[in-house]
Curated annotation (Swiss-Prot):
Protein name as catalogued: C-type polyheme cytochrome OmcB
Gene3D superfamilies (alphabetical): Flavocytochrome C3, Chain A (1.10.1130.10)
Binding-site positions, heme c 1: C48, C51, H52
Lineage top rank: taxon: Bacteria
Compartments, record wording: Cell outer membrane
Binding site for heme c 7: C303, C306, H307
PTM annotation, UniProt: Binds 12 heme c groups per subunit.
Length: 744
């Protein structure tokens, strides 16, 4: 039996994706003569069916032709049997055929990302948990830990929650076989690559029903994967965990491993609607909770949105890191997996499951994803970077993307409407940046030309024109540039017309690292040069101009050439923030010999960068402009003590009189100094991205705001802040060491 299973497993691995493009294989599935794969003429499906209609799958007894005609994407796409097996003109039932038993590598011949959608099945499955797991043939375990048990259970209806699987009547519905084998391609795929249909039992010893946990009346990927990796009951009505209610949400019990939190999909893939942001237009939802990822359950690839055939996530504590766990602990996921680990700690069993289900991230670590009701139309302009949906839609079609977010649909979020949004929020999921998580294929927005909207306000009589800045094409790093260019640039201030210089602060927004890297987003003072030195090379990393640093541009070249690529961190740090290791391989390519970087040197550089920004903040405070890290960022120092007192740090006390410092003619330069401070405070890696550009911005901002003149008296300006007790001497010394005694 096992030999037959092995034989048909190979045959059934024709395709692992439901999409294939015309042009693969024969010209016509019904036999217009042409040359098929393997260089042999084709004869059409009718000839195949004549002889092979009686051939059955050894394990199930089902007709292979019936399976193919029922579910194969190659049949419905009009490709035909010969698109996988090769031309049949020499076959005639006994002669050769090019690919009698096509395997996963045969699939890859067409599924290369060009002819048809790419698949990582030919390489990834071999090392997957599905392929290397221990065969378990016990009454319950064989349902998901053997090929035969899974396939026969699909037919018998032995699928469902714990009560269903532990019921002996249900167990006895599944025929026994003489031996059991590993999960294979054929466990999930019928002949021709279609997904197997799954039956379930409604409760213990209940009637057999269709397994349809996303309740869309279609056999799809979510049904297949969650038949073992349970998340919902057969009709989607009940969340399956360990049976303990979660913040008022009733749950059932998963089919097995109900006391092992990292085996329960819902501990990481369920975001509790009841704890989400306030619904409604304009709702802020500040400090909403996100407990898990929200799956696009009825989409084409709800599981393959983030997984491929590698089937190895390694969520279990202590396991080797994977791309999935790196991402889940990263800022793009708000550190959600870290929150789960911290909540579980040393707990075990049901207590661990409860802790994991209730663990969440909020504004503390995930402010980019939790602070507002991002999917409501009132936040439409934010959706490009604060939702995976907006990011994916922009990168798929930058020219056609509506910056108001009007084209974004979040129908996979519970209760969503465009006006009110949903009480669930997205993180930056894998599919935000990738078109294919299994192969790693990135979205391709091309070189980013950013349109920084004009600054306009009817209340202050302010008008401004839009500013357009073109950035170079940096391959895969274009994906990063999509959201790391800020919302406003220094040029926006220069493009403003305002009669009295009294207006709200122009906010650069956060983490605009790409703009600093290419020296384009700061407020640049007239008569000063900001051209990069000829030897500056950080903007060339990941290009042909910097051999040995990769091919995906500077963002990926620095942040993703580490053992933990999807942590997006080029260094590791200890609890104090000190750099403990430089893990990016790009650094050592150039910084070698006398220019070699050390963790200690990089820590010192960062500390001096921060000190120079403290000096700039102090100089601004000396003019009555107080910085506080909350919108609108700059406030009036009403008692002139140089300190942001609680009563001063409120939005009604926002600093707006920029002309009041040095007169109407210079108001833009005053705001420019504040703009540069805000821009760089919110780019903590600015010292590494482009140290020449950021030093010049800080130098010129301190130089100007101190006395309204660009006269290079920066050292005196910093010393004056110490004298006025707005800056301590140690910080002043570090700031002067960073900036030097002459303009960088």
């Amino acid at each position: 039996m096992s030999r037959k299973v092995t034989k048909y497993s190979a045959v059934l691995a024709v395709s692992l994706f439901a999409a294939a493009l015309a042009g693969c294989g024969s010209e016509n599935k019904e036999g217009t003569v042409g040359t098929g794969p393997g260089g042999v003429a084709t004869v059409g499906d009718s000839a195949c069916v004549q002889c092979h209609s009686a051939v059955t799958e050894a394990l199930t007894g089902e007709s292979l032709i019936a399976q193919y005609q029922k579910s194969s994407p190659h049949n419905t796409a009009g490709l035909g049997c010969e698109s996988c097996h090769g031309g049949g003109a020499q076959h005639n039932g006994v002669g050769p055929i090019p690919f009698a038993q096509p395997d996963a590598s045969r699939c890859a011949d067409c599924h290369d990302g060009t002819t048809a959608v790419a698949t990582n099945s030919d390489t990834a499955f071999a090392e997957s948990r599905h392929n290397i797991q221990t065969i378990r043939s016990g009454a319950t375990c064989r349902r998901c830990h053997t090929h035969e048990g899974a396939v026969l259970s699909n037919i018998a209806g032995y699928t469902g929650d714990l009560a269903t699987l532990e019921d002996t009547v249900n167990q006895n519905k599944v025929p026994l076989v003489s031996s059991y084998s590993q999960i294979s391609c054929a466990t999930c795929h019928e002949h021709g690559g279609g997904l197997r249909t799954i039956k379930a039992t409604n409760g213990a010893a209940g009637p057999v029903v269709n397994w349809d946990p996303n309740n869309n009346r279609t056999v799809d990927q979510f049904d297949l994967c969650t038949s073992c990796h349970n998340m919902y009951s057969y009709n989607g009505s009940t969340l399956l965990t360990n049976g303990v209610p979660v913040n008022g949400v009733a749950t059932g019990t998963v089919g097995h491993h109900e006391t092992t939190w990292y085996r329960i999909i819902a501990t990481t893939h369920f975001d509790n609607y009841s704890t989400g942001p306030q619904a409604g237009a304009g709702a802020s939802g500040t400090n909403a909770k996100v407990e898990g990822y929200v799956l696009r359950r009825t989409g084409a690839n709800p599981c393959f949105d983030c997984h491929g055939h590698e089937a190895k996530t390694n969520t279990r504590p202590g396991r080797d890191a994977t791309i999935h766990t790196d991402w889940a602990k990263s800022a793009h996921a708000g550190g959600l997996l870290t929150a789960k680990y911290n909540a579980v700690g040393a707990l075990t069993g049901a207590a661990a499951v409860n802790a994991a289900m209730n663990a969440y991230v909020d504004d503390t670590t995930a402010i980019a994803w939790t602070h507002y009701n991002w999917d409501a139309s009132s936040r439409g302009s934010c959706q490009r970077c604060h939702t995976a949906t907006g990011a994916a839609n922009f990168m798929s079609n930058p020219a056609g993307y509506d910056p108001t977010g009007a084209g974004n649909s979040f129908s996979h979020l519970q209760g969503w409407s465009a006006a009110n949004g949903s009480k669930q929020n997205e993180l930056l999921y894998c599919w935000g940046c990738h078109t294919n998580a299994g192969t790693g294929e990135l979205r391709n927005p091309g070189a980013i030309t950013e349109n920084y909207a004009g600054v306009n306000s009817t209340s202050t009589g302010t008008t401004g024109t839009a500013v357009t800045i073109s950035y170079p094409d940096i391959a895969g790093s274009n994906v990063c540039m999509t959201c790391h260019l800020g919302r406003e640039a220094g040029e926006n201030i220069k493009a403003i017309t305002d009669a009295d210089g009294i207006l709200g602060f122009v906010n650069s927004h956060y983490l605009a690292a790409g703009g600093q890297l290419f020296g384009k987003t700061g407020y640049e003072y007239a008569t000063r040069s900001y051209a990069k030195p000829t030897f500056f090379a950080h903007d060339k990393i990941g290009t042909a101009a910097a051999p040995g640093t990769g091919t995906n541009g500077p963002c990926a070249g620095c942040h993703m050439t580490t053992p933990n690529s999807h942590s997006f961190l080029p260094v590791t740090k200890d609890g104090t923030g000190a750099v403990t290791a430089i893990t990016s391989t790009a650094c050592a390519t150039c910084h070698a010999g006398a220019y070699a970087l050390t963790p200690e040197a990089l820590t010192a550089e960062e500390e001096e960068y921060v000190a120079s920004l403290e000096a700039l903040k102090a100089a601004l405070a000396g003019k009555g402009i107080l910085f506080f890290n909350a919108h609108p960022y700059f406030y009036r120092d009403t008692n002139a003590n140089g300190i942001g007192d609680p009563g001063e740090l409120v939005s009604s006390n926002a600093f707006t009189n920029w002309a009041g410092v040095y007169g109407l003619a210079l108001w833009k330069d005053v705001m420019g100094a504040a703009f540069n401070a805000n821009l760089l405070i919110h780019d903590p890696g600015g010292y590494a991205h482009n140290r020449f550009y950021v030093k010049r911005l800080i130098w010129d901002s301190i130089d100007f705001i101190y006395d309204g003149v660009l006269n290079n008296d920066v050292t005196a300006a910093i010393d004056a802040q110490v004298t006025a007790t707005r800056l301590d001497s140690a910080t002043a010394t570090a700031a002067k060491a960073y900036l030097g005694t002459t303009r960088p």
